[in-house]
Amino acid sequence: MGSKGKKGKSSEVNLETSKNKEKNIKGKKKNSLDPIEKNKQETAGLQTTSRPTAKQLVGGSSWTGKIPVVLLNEHCQRSKWEKSDVKVRQTKSKNYIFTSVVLAKKDPKNPSILDHVSLIPPKSYYENGYFPEKETLVEARNVGAVYALHRIMSHKSLQHALPPEHRNIWFDMEKQKKEELKNKHSWLYNEDPFKAAKELQAARASSAAKPPPKASQKNEKVSLTSIKNTSLSHFSKFNFKYALPIHMSLENRRSLENLFRNMNTWDILEDTKNLEPDTSIVNDLISLGFRDIHAKEACQYCVSLEDALEWLIIHVPEDDLPTRFLPSDYTTGISVQNLNSANLAIHYNAKRISETGYSFDLCFSTLQTFENNIQISSEYLQQHLIGESFDGNISLEPNSTEWDDDVSALQSILDNKVSKIENGCRVRIDYPTSEFGELFVDFRRPARSYPAHIPLMSLSSTKRMASYIKLSILKKMVVYAMDLRGECMLSWLYNHLQENIEDFLQNIGSLLNISAATIGVSLSSQNKSAPTAKKNNSFKPKLFRRSRELSEKLCNNWSERVKSPSYQLKVREREKLPAWESRRKIMDAIQHSQVVVISGETGSGKSTQVVQFILDHYLSSGEKDLQTVVCTQPRRISAISLAERVAFERDTTVGKEVGYSVHGEKSISKETLLEFCTTGLLLRRIQQHGLGFLSTLSCVVVDEVHERSIENDILLTLLKLVISRIPNLKVILMSATVNSDTFKYYFGNAGHLHIHGRTFPIKDYYIEDFAPKLNEDDDEEDVPRRKKKEYEIDYHLISRLVSSIDAELGSSSGSILVFLPGVSNIARCIREIKSKDGSKFEVLPLHASLNTSEQRRCFKTYTKRKIICATNIAETSITIDDVVAVIDSGRVKQIDYDVERDLVTFKETWASRAACQQRRGRAGRVKKGICYKLYTRGFEEKGMLGQTPPEVLRTALSQVCLNVVPLVKRFSSAGNSVNQGSIKKFMNSLIDPPNDATVDLALKKLIQVGALTVSEDLTGLGEYLVSLPIDLKLGKLLVFGSIFGYLEPALTITAILSTKSPFLGDDEAREIRSKQSQGWGDVLADARVYHNWLEILETRGVKKTVQWCEEMHLHYTTLQQIRQNRNELSEAAQLLELTTKKLTGNFDWYSTENLTVLSTLIAAALSPNVVKCVYPDKKFVASFSGSLEMEQEARLTKFYDQNNQRLFIHPSSTMFVNSPNASRCTFVAYEQKVETTKPFLRNCTPINTYGMILLGANDILIDPLGKGLILDQAYCIKAWPKVVILLKMLKRCLDASLHERLESSSGLNYESEIHQCIRTLIAGNGV
C-alpha cells in the first residue's frame, strides 16, 4: 500500500494527447535508443571473454524463454499499440532503476495523434524493495516491463513465462493488487489502460464540477478532538444510503429513560469531584450544541466523549437537545392515544399542565390520583418539585380577600406589565437577552388558603424554552416562597425573580436535581442503588485442608478397623483379584514416578483396588497431614457404584472414609480420604480454585482414559502443565484398553504397569450363527445393508434371542445385558421384550439420563431373570456382577460434527472393535459367558474401526474451546484475563491436537455468536454456554428462552433443530407446512405441528394420532424422537436453574406478540446465520376506494449476507412461496446453507429490525452524532441519536444481567424491567 497524501496514491495515470508528425515520432524513437547504445558501450568495456546477451543478463545463462520487455512489446503489437517506453534513472550508487512505463496508441480517427498513458508505481513499492536496483539499463527496463505487464495482464497467469527473479516481483504485485482492490482501485488493473484513464479523468472532472452541499445545523460537520482512536472516528467508512430506518415511540423512549435513570448507572467519579472537567471533552460537547453547564456536569460522571454523550442524551430533556440529535420531523408535544371520554379530559388537562415543564406522564398520573382536579394536582407537582410532602386529602377552600388584594396591589405597582388570567395574573419579566423572546411568570391561586400556602407559579415565553430550564427557575422560586408563608408575597416573588433572572438563566443548575419533575419519577427512586447484583447467600465451596488432629484420628480409626474380623474377611475376598498380586509392583511404580500408566484387563480389579492400595499406603505410613485421593469416572453411575463397592470392601459407609461427588448429588465429609467424582466435576473445581485445590490432593487417578473423551483429554493436559509445580502430586492413568505408549510419550518419563485380568471363557456367536435357528433371514449378504445409514436394529430378533437365551440357561441364575445405541432404542426394545414374554423377565433400562435411584435398580437381585437394556454406559466402570450373557447390537450413539449444518449431533453409528470387546467382557465376570453379536464376522473385521477416534477430533471445536476458556483463564499468567492466543496454545498441547485452522475457525465462531470477546474473554452469554452440555446455537436458544420467559417453546424448537423437521419430503407436505407457517417461517411451523401432535396424542390416543400424522404428511417416529430429546433438554435446563420468569398458562402458538419475540430468540441462537431482506419497489393498483398496494411475489424479494453476497430461499422452505411481511421481516435467520445451482437457505425464520439489533446481532457499532448503527460490521440502521443511545444502553444492561444471572440466582436489580423493555420493543418493532 502507498503512503498517504500525494505520494500515497496507488498510481498516477496521465493521459496526454498531442499532435506529432511521423518524423517527430521516429525522432523520438531514435533518441530513445541512445541509452541502449550507451549500455552497449559499458558492457563492451568489461574485461570478459564474451559479451552476454540481453536474455542472459535478464534471465541468466540457463533461461531459454522470452524476457519481460519482449513479452510486453509483443502484447503492445497485438493490441495495435506503439512500442512501450520504460523510463529509467541512475541512482546515487551508480545503479539503474525504472521510474515509469509509457504506453501509446494512435487515435483511430486521426493516426497523427497519439494517446499516452504513464504507468507510475507508488513510492511505497520502492520503499518495500519490490523493484531492486540493477547494474545495467537492460535489467532495469525488464523490471519495469514486469510492472507494466502486471498492470494490464494480471488476470492471466503470466508469471510462469517470466524468469525466476521476475516471478517474485509478479507475486509481490499480486499481494498489492488485493490491497488495491479492497480500496476500490480496480481501474488500475484494466486490460485497456487508455480507456481506464479516460474514465478516471471524466470522473474527476465531474466530481470537481459538483457544488459543495449546503451545510445545515443538523448535518454540519464538527471537528472533535476527543474522539481520535475511538470507535466514533472509524464510523465514516460505512454507507448509509440504503440504511434501514427504525423508529421508537414516545412511550417506549420514556420507559427506557426512566429505567436507566432509576438504575443510576452513572456514579459520580470520586477522583473528579474536586478536579476541573476534561477541557477537550467539554469543548467538543459545546460544539455539538450542548450547554456549557451540562457538558461540565456530564464530565462529573463520564471520562470519555462517548459516555458523556450517552449521559447527556439520557438526562437532557428532548426539548432542550441540540437539533442534530433530533429527527427532522421531531415535534414537541403529546402523542395521540385511543382514550375513553373520562381519560380524554385528563389527557387534555395533563397536556395543559405539562406545558409548564412537568412530564406529561407525571401530570397524567397526578390528575388521575386527584380526580382531574387541576388546582390540587398543580399544587402537588409544585411541592413534589422540592421534595415536600403533600396531603392529598384536601378540598378546595373558599376564596379569600387576601389573594385578590395581593393581585390588585401587584397590578397597581407594575401597571402594564401585569395581565389578568384565570385564578391569577401574568407578569412580564425583563432580562438582558432575547433568547426566549418575552418571558412571563404566572401566579395562580393555590388550592389551599393563601397566604398560608404559596401560590401556583409557572414560567412561559414567546420563544421555545426547555422544560427543565423552566422548572429549574421555578424550583428556586418555590424554595424562596416557602419562607414567605403567612404574608402576602406576590410582589416579593416578582422582585426576587426580576433581580435574579440573569443569574438563574446562567446557572440553571444540575440536571439531576430536577429530574423528578421532568421525567416523572419520585425522588426516592433516584436514590435506588446502582445495578448491583442481589447476591444470594448460597454456600460457595471453599478449599478444605485437613487438620493434623483429624489426620491422626483417621489413621487410628483405620488401624483399629483393619483388625476387625469383618474387614479381614473382605480383604481375603480382595486377595482373589489379579490386582492384589501386583500390589507391591503398583506401589513401587507410583513411588518412583510422578505419573504412572496402569492397564488392566476386564475383571482385574484395577478400578476398585488401585485406589485402595494408594490410600492404605498413606494411612500406614503415618502421614501427619493426610490429603485426599481423587478418582475420576466418565459417568455419574460409575462414580457412585464404585464408591459404594469400595466403601463396602473397607468395612465403612459411603460418605465417611470413602465418598462420591457427582453433578447434583454428593456424599462426602471431612473424614473422606478417597473420593470418586466425574471428570467434569473435577475440572470445575480446578477452574474455581486452580493450583490451590490440586495442592490439597495427594493423588489424582484418571480412570477409563481409553475413552478419550474431551473432558479426559483436557484434564490430562492440565495435569501435565501443573505437575511440575506440585511435585508431591501423583497422577495415575488407568484403563482396560489403554495404549500405554501414547500416554508414556505424552507425559515424558511416565511409568507403566499391566495387570492381567480374571475372566471366564466367553463364547461368541455372530448373527450368521443364530439367526437361522430363530428363523431370521440374515447372513453375510446383509453386510452391505448394515453399513448403510438407514440400517435399523431388529428388535423382534432381540426379543426372540432373549427368550432363546433364557430357555438355554434354564434354572441357572444370571442376567442378560443388551447393548443399544440410545434412549429411544432402549424404550422400543423394552416394549418388544415385554410384549412377548413380559411376565417372565424384569426388564430395566440403563442410560445416563436416568436418575441415580433408577440406575441402581440394575444392580439389585430379582426373582425373575433380569434383562438390562443399556447404552455404552455399561461398557466400562459399571460392573453388574450377575451378567452371564451379552447381546451386542454393535451400534452406538456417538458425538459427531455435522459440517453442513454446523451442528453437534449424537449420531448413531457402528461401534469400534475395541468397544465391542469391552461389551463382550461384561459376560465373563462370574462364570462362563456367551456373547451374541448382531453383525457378521466379516463385518467385524472389515467394517468396524479398531479404536474410537478421540472425541476432540470428531466434534465442533467451538464448544471445546469455549469449555477451555475458564481453565486457561485460571492458569494464565495475567491472572484475571486470558492472553490472546492462549486457547490455541492450550489446544496444541492436547494429546491429539487439532490443526490451527480448525481452532481459528472455532474461535471466530465463538466471537460471532457472542460467547467470546476479541481478546478471548468470556462474555455473559459465554459463561452460560460453558455450563450447558449442548451445541452452542441450541444452548444459546435455551439461555435466551429461559431468561425471557419462553423456556417451554424454546425447548421444543431446540429439540426440533437437534433432530429434523417432522414433515415428509413430498409436495403435499410442503404445502401443509406452508399453511402452518402463516408467514412465520419453517421452524415455528414445525413447532406448531409438534404441539398439535402432542395435544392429539394426549386426548385421542395413538391410533387417531397416527391417522392424523398420515393426513398431515408427518413422520410419527420423528415426532417421538423430538419429544424424547425435549424431555432430556428439559432436565438439563432445570439443573442450571436459568429460568427468571415463567409464562402463565400454556404458550399461545398463534399470538403475534409471542411469535415475534420467539422468532427473535431463534435468530439470536442461529446468529451469525442471518441475511438482510431487500424488497422490490412498491406497486399500486387503482380501485374504487383509491390506490391499493399490490402484493409482491416472494421471488422478487432478495437476500444478502454480511459479505453482500446474494442468497436464495430453498424451494423446500415455507418462505419460498410465501412472501414475507415487510413490516415484521427485515432480516431472515437460517439454520443451514447449501449450494447446488445456487446458494440456498434452509429452515428460515423472519425477524424484524429491533429483534436483530437487540438479540440477533453480536457486534454493534453506534454513531451518536447522527447516522445510526452498524450491525455485525455489515448492516446499516438509520436512527436518530437518542434512539441509538437508548438501544446501546439497553444492550449493555442485557449483557450485564447475563453476567450477574450466572453469579447470583437473584440476578440484577431491574432485571425484569430490562427484559420487559426488550420484549416490548421487539413485539412492536419499536412502535
Curated annotation (Swiss-Prot):
Q: Which residues bind ATP?
A: G600, E601, T602, G603, S604, G605, K606, S607
Q: What is this protein called?
A: Putative ATP-dependent RNA helicase ucp12
Q: What is the lineage of its organism?
A: Eukaryota, Fungi, Dikarya, Ascomycota, Taphrinomycotina
Q: Specify the Helicase C-terminal domain's residue ranges.
A: 797-968
Q: Where is this region: Disordered?
A: 1-58, 201-222
The UniProt regions of compositional bias labelled Basic and acidic residues, in chain numbering, are: 18-41
Domain spans labelled RWD: 405-504
Q: Where is the composition biased (Polar residues)?
A: 42-58
Q: Which domain of life is it from?
A: Eukaryota
Task: Describe the task this protein carries out.
Answer: Probable ATP-binding RNA helicase.
Which segments constitute the Helicase ATP-binding domain? 587-756
Q: Which residues cross the membrane?
A: none
Q: Name one GO molecular function term.
A: RNA helicase activity
Task: State the gene name recorded for this protein.
Answer: ucp12
Q: What is its EC number?
A: 3.6.4.13
- Residue stretches making up the UBA domain: 276-315
